[in-house]
Amino acid sequence: MDAKLSPNQGLNISGIGLASSLAAGLGIAALTLDWIANRNPWQGTSLTLPLLLCTIASAIAGYFVVPLLQALKTGQIIREDGPQAHLKKAGTPTMGGIFFIPVAVVGACVLSNFATEVLAVSALTLSYGLIGWIDDWQILRRKSNKGISPRMKLALQICFAAAFCLWLMFNQPANITSIALPWVSFALPLGFLFWPLAGFVLVAESNATNLTDGIDGLAGGTVAIALLALGAIVAPTSPALMVFCAALSGSCLGFLAHNRNPARVFMGDTGSLALGGALAAVALLTNSLVALFILSGIFFVETLSVMAQVSYYKATKGPDGKGKRLLKMAPLHHHLELSGWSELQVVSSFYVIATILAVICLAIAPF
């Protein structure tokens, strides 16, 4: 008898199984990378210890904070025009970023002995988290999907990005305005043009991770993979920022204990904007923009899918004011859901892609 293969066949894994597999995989990766670099994995300046400590601390913090968020009635407002399977998520607490982001920041600061660059990146991370919190709070207060206006959100992102760039301008070496190309012994000098690019990267990366946060465990897992790889790449030149990346990666893993399918809490803009800001800030500080571009492949594709959807809709708009859609729904992960993929299939596939991108980055990195 002929049988039609559905997108969900062949995937027999639970949300907790997927999250556990990711945590185990990143733990083994951290140990391996420390071993390759001749680092003691159980010292503060490593990948393994910050990853492990912040995973545990974030997971434990969630058991206290998630019930509090439930009691405060911070339930997520679900879009009615989205995938119908998401309607059952209505009421799930959001703002999860308020516990796992601070856990990572505190852990990184302590383990790095409050290194200046870690304090700077932490300040940018918390600033973007604050923007997200304001947006999340407005959504909850108004009981709709509309938070602060896009213009206000963008203005705040630009302001904090400008402040970080000013600090970078006066506290980092002059060659920071040259972009290192890892596969050739050459740096692309940008001069003053570096600064508008830096501001753009901070804003774009935070919004890209924000768009990726649409399925249980998706943003948390893919960012955890990117952060650990970025930490390994920057380790030779900035051990303190390696610790920061490992701590934030671990905190994402701890958050997945509560955000894996079916999620008990969402990170909200509080978490997603902070994560994107952190990735961009570390890359700018360590001249790792090429690595960031590769590691952020999933986030950029998600963003491009939204841009393509909007552009195509406007270009095909007829006299009735309605246009055609390129995708069933943007971002891409929602299109895949509406095409018959399960949430777990989308998330596991994106984890695999994120891992491949991380391996590519590590392969070309000048260790």
From Swiss-Prot:
EC number of this enzyme: 2.7.8.13
GO biological process: cell division; cell wall organization; peptidoglycan biosynthetic process; regulation of cell shape
Keyword Metal-binding attributed: yes
Cofactors: Mg(2+)
Membrane topology: Multi-pass membrane protein
Known role: Catalyzes the initial step of the lipid cycle reactions in the biosynthesis of the cell wall peptidoglycan: transfers peptidoglycan precursor phospho-MurNAc-pentapeptide from UDP-MurNAc-pentapeptide onto the lipid carrier undecaprenyl phosphate, yielding undecaprenyl-pyrophosphoryl-MurNAc-pentapeptide, known as lipid I.
Principal subcellular localisation of the protein: membrane
Protein family (similarity comment): Belongs to the glycosyltransferase 4 family. MraY subfamily.
GO molecular function annotations of the record: metal ion binding; phospho-N-acetylmuramoyl-pentapeptide-transferase activity; UDP-N-acetylmuramoyl-L-alanyl-D-glutamyl-meso-2,6-diaminopimelyl-D-alanyl-D-alanine:undecaprenyl-phosphate transferase activity
Pathways per UniProt: Cell wall biogenesis; peptidoglycan biosynthesis
Transmembrane residue ranges: 13-33, 49-69, 95-115, 119-139, 154-174, 183-203, 215-235, 237-257, 281-301, 347-367
HAMAP family named among the record's database cross-references: MraY (MF_00038)
Organism: Trichormus variabilis (strain ATCC 29413 / PCC 7937)
A GO cellular component entry from the record: plasma membrane
Reaction equation(s) it catalyzes: UDP-N-acetyl-alpha-D-muramoyl-L-alanyl-gamma-D-glutamyl-meso-2,6-diaminopimeloyl-D-alanyl-D-alanine + di-trans,octa-cis-undecaprenyl phosphate = di-trans,octa-cis-undecaprenyl diphospho-N-acetyl-alpha-D-muramoyl-L-alanyl-D-glutamyl-meso-2,6-diaminopimeloyl-D-alanyl-D-alanine + UMP
Keywords of this entry: Cell cycle, Cell division, Cell inner membrane, Cell membrane, Cell shape, Cell wall biogenesis/degradation, Magnesium, Membrane, Metal-binding, Peptidoglycan synthesis, Transferase, Transmembrane, Transmembrane helix
Localization of this protein: Cell inner membrane
InterPro entries linked to this entry: Glycosyl_transferase_4, PNAcMuramoyl-5peptid_Trfase, PNAcMuramoyl-5peptid_Trfase_CS
Enzyme's top EC category: transferase
Protein name: Phospho-N-acetylmuramoyl-pentapeptide-transferase
Pfam families from the UniProt entry: Glycos_transf_4, MraY_sig1
